[in-house]
Design a protein with these regions (language model features):
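Short, hinge-like loop/turn segments at secondary-structure boundaries
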Residues: 18-21, 43-44, 97-104
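Cofactor-binding loop segments of dinucleotide-utilizing enzymes, especially the Rossmann-like FAD-
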Residues: 5-7, 56, 85-88
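Structural motif
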Residues: 33-39
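A cross-family acyltransferase "interaction/gating" segment
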Residues: 66-125
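Catalytic core of membrane glycerolipid acyltransferases/transacylases, capturing the structured
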Residues: 1-33, 76, 91-92
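Catalytic-site beta-strand/loop segments enriched in glycine and acidic/polar residues
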Residues: 40-76
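Membrane-interfacial terminal anchoring regions of lipid-handling membrane enzymes
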Residues: 46, 130-164
Length: 164
């Protein structure tokens, strides 16, 4: 399950994700659309389905984690697992969006980096939830810093070499 905006840009991304076999949960900035998508995502997580959310939301700013991901984790009882994918390869489909969203094109080599799970106590205060939100941001920043070096390490192992 991937939560994606109901915007025009989101429609393109949703179609790609569905073609790749992902279930898409659509939400909009308005309270009703956002609440419906949030409740649907919480329900999916409570039924042990996976969920993915771009933590900077549909309108940014880029790399600033919104509080919605913390609320979803808190209400579902599931941890937040920071994920960052990286490739220096320029062959990406680039979208003219505020966050410069990119989708890998054809045989792009990329790596996924995963951070430690971040748990949210259901009894947290608003201040504690804010600390969790900041922790998510910091974890993603750290993965982004590590990505170029980790990519080089993976590439050195020859994982993507063509078999003869």
């Amino acid at each position: 399950n991937i939560m994606i905006s109901r915007s025009r840009d989101g429609e393109i991304i949703a179609k790609v994700c569905e073609k790749w076999g992902f279930k898409v949960v659509r939400g909009s900035k308005g309270k009703k659309g956002s609440a419906e998508a949030t409740l649907q995502m919480i329900n999916e997580l409570k039924h042990d389905n996976y969920g993915a959310i771009m933590v900077d939301g549909p309108h940014g700013p880029a790399k600033v984690c919104k509080d919605g991901v913390v609320k979803i984790a808190k209400l579902s009882g599931k941890p937040i697992v920071p994920v960052f994918w990286y490739s220096p390869n320029p062959t990406f489909l680039k979208f003219p969006t505020w966050d410069k969203f990119r989708i890998p094109f054809f045989s792009t080599h990329l790596i996924n980096l995963y951070g430690e799970p971040i748990y949210v106590d259901k009894n947290n205060t608003d201040e504690q939830d804010e600390q969790v939100r900041l922790k998510v941001e910091k974890a993603l920043e750290e993965l982004e810093k590590q990505a170029p070096q980790r990519y080089k390490e993976v590439f050195r192992f020859g994982i993507w070499k063509k078999k003869k």
